[in-house]
Each structure stands twice: as C-alpha cells, then as structure tokens.
Regions:
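Hydrophobic alpha-helical transmembrane segments in multi-pass integral membrane proteins
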Residues: 68-79, 123-135
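Hydrophobic faces of alpha-helical transmembrane segments in multi-pass integral membrane proteins
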Residues: 10-22, 54, 58-70, 86-98, ...
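Pore- and pathway-forming membrane helices of multi-pass small-molecule/ion transporters and channels
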Residues: 30-47, 95-128
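A cytosolic-side transmembrane-helix exit/cap motif
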Residues: 51-62, 104-114, 129-140, 159-163
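Interhelical loops and loop-helix junctions of multi-pass membrane transporters/channels
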Residues: 3, 8, 12, 78-89, ...
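Alpha-helical transmembrane segments and their membrane-interface boundaries
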Residues: 1-51, 127-135, 143-167
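Alpha-helical membrane segments and adjacent membrane-interface helices in multi-pass membrane proteins
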Residues: 35-74
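Interfacial loop-to-helix junctions that mark the boundaries of transmembrane helices
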Residues: 26-28, 78-86, 102-104, 132-137
C-alpha cells in the first residue's frame, strides 16, 4: 500500500485553492465553469504534459465549435432527411473525420474534440446555452488552469530545491 506523500498533500492544497479561485471568479462573472474544469481534468489525464496542452485546448475548442456547425448542417439537411437522420449523419461524419484525420491534424481531430462535442451537446439542452461563452471559458479559463497547475509545480520544485540545499 502506498504511503501518503507530503508533496502530493501540498500539491492538493495548492490545487484546491486554484479550483476555489476559478469557481468563485467564474460564478461571479456568471460564466459556465465546466469547459475550464474539463481542460484541467484532461491536462491531468495527460500527466501534465505541456506538449499536449495545445491539443487539449484546441481540440476542446473545436469540439464545442462543432455545435455551431451541426446547427448549420441540421438547418440545411433536416428538411430533406428529417432531424434524427440529419443529426446521425453529422455525428457519423464527425467521428469518421476524427479517426481519419487524427494523425494528420491531431491538434483539432482528437479525443478531446469528441468529448467536448459530447458534453457541449448535452449542455446545449440546458436553458440559455451560450456556445461562444463556453468557447471563451474553455480557452481562457482552461489555459489559466493549465498555467496555474504549472505554477504549482514550479513552486513545489523550488520548495524541494530549497529543502535539498538545507540537507
């Protein structure tokens, strides 16, 4: 069984402060918090690899933006195909493009794109959805969360270096 790590406990304290600040600011501004927090979760899932940050941010942004594209497609295709079939066609093409172009344009066509499209689609069913707001929160808030996490890591690194000098 693993032991409690002092570094993880300290990281956790800094992280909950970051989360609280993010939640308070977004709530005060009456902005949806979920896009920024999804970025945070995916950044952790990517083991805080800064090389994946652009794929997470831009893939997520593209996923949310697809709500605009599907609306345009449905407006054009639903009269002839019916709403359900038009929606299915769009989703099938969207998933196919993620698979087909995932290695060609991985910054946009990736799993983050698909997950943000799915969650944004569900969020769009709530009262007063605001896709453009979600996109802004995803990029700005998510980017700030990534920066905050990296800042926490630097602080912990500096603390460890200071401790190493003392011993």
């Amino acid at each position: 069984m693993a032991k409690l790590s002092k570094d993880r406990l300290i990281f956790g304290l800094f992280l909950i402060v970051l989360i609280a600040i993010g939640e308070i600011v977004l709530t005060k501004l009456k902005l949806a918090a979920w896009p920024a927090f999804m970025i945070m979760i995916f950044f952790f899932e990517a083991h805080m690899d800064t090389k994946k940050a652009a794929n997470i941010l831009l893939g997520g942004l593209f996923g949310i933006a697809n709500l605009i594209l599907i609306k345009m497609f449905l407006d054009a295709a639903a009269p002839s195909l019916g709403l359900d079939l038009a929606k299915l066609v769009y989703i099938l093409v969207f998933v196919y493009l993620i698979v087909a172009l995932g290695e060609v344009v991985p910054i946009l066509f990736n799993n983050y794109c698909f997950m943000f499209f799915l969650v944004a689609g569900l969020a769009a069913m709530t009262p007063a959805p605001n896709v453009f707001q979600w996109m802004a929160v995803e990029i700005v808030g998510g980017g700030l969360f990534i920066a905050g996490i990296l800042c926490i890591m630097k602080i912990l690194g500096a603390m460890a270096a200071k401790k190493a000098v003392k011993t």
